[in-house]
Amino acid sequence: MAFTPFPPRQPAASARLPLTLISLEDWALATITGPDSEKYLQGQVTADVTELGENQHLLVAHCDAKGKMWSNLRLFRHGDGFAWIERRSVRDTQLAEMKKYAVFSKVTIAPNDDAVLLGVAGFQARAALANHFATLPDEQNPRVVDGATTLLWFGLPAERFMVITDAETASQLSDKLHGEAQLNASAQWLALDIEAGFPVIDAPNSNQFIPQATNIQALGGISFKKGCYAGQEMVARAKFRGANKRSLWYLAGHGSRVPQPGEDIEMQMGENWRRTGTVLAAVQLDDGRLLAQVVMNNDLETGTLFRVREESGAHTLHIEPLPYSLEEA
């Protein structure tokens, strides 16, 4: 029994989001299993996998030899191995790169499209889920397992949950919440990730940025104490030699269209506009506002104005504060 994604509607900002059940069709799951899974993953990603507890999840980066990210991964322990969530558009490429050296290790790396990914967010999301699961994750235990279901907790931009489960449980949850929750497609979760400052890597931006250019270090996703991993030299150089000049910015305002991942935007300089940055993700909300996540120089003045490329009207975008410090977590 396949689970059918919900029809899309315009996403809402977290501050006024009603209880919403979200199908996460633009995200995908993958796993690594086998006796060598921890050791192998330790040599592939930026975080110290050995320190990842059963009750935790973490946003980490998987880089090439030059330190450019194939993708970022929402990583957690799963069974006798690990699982991670990433954007569906990058999963095949990311898995192919991670498998390159797997022949020498006792591991199996595979996509998992049998699992269903759902988000629960908005007004009284915790209370709604408490009726269906015995234990819910929280700030102290952001990952819990309830039977066939893994639940992940997120505190930003407001409390929300990711539900990783089978099609039967997903359908049951959908049926039970149908009367009290609105349904929406994955653009709503994307809007919340933009507000949260969680970097979103889609295919056009794969293999383009070092992790620090997307604030992974501020989210606790880089260990500078662990042993060798793919891209470590360049990631370390960015920290210790100040080689990274970019960071992730959260912009909000209005635009005549929604910019696509990989596009640049325009920055106001006096009477003129100059192209800058790279869009990671953008959405238009139900109130007409445009939210965008853009990698730009990390020394920008907070009052700088921006606009969508080739914007003809008076629409502009401004910098919004991120809900976390850019210091290393």
From Swiss-Prot:
Its main location: cytoplasm. One of its GO terms (molecular function) is folic acid binding. PANTHER family: TRANSFERASE CAF17, MITOCHONDRIAL-RELATED. It comes from Cronobacter sakazakii (strain ATCC BAA-894) (Enterobacter sakazakii). HAMAP family: tRNA_modifying_YgfZ. Folate binds at W27, W189. This is tRNA-modifying protein YgfZ. Belongs to the tRNA-modifying YgfZ family. Keywords: Cytoplasm, Folate-binding, tRNA processing. It is found in: Cytoplasm. Gene3D superfamilies: 2.40.30.160, 3.30.70.1630, Aminomethyltransferase beta-barrel domains (3.30.70.1400). NCBIfam families: PRK09559.1, ygfZ_signature. Folate-binding protein involved in regulating the level of ATP-DnaA and in the modification of some tRNAs. It is probably a key factor in regulatory networks that act via tRNA modification, such as initiation of chromosomal replication.
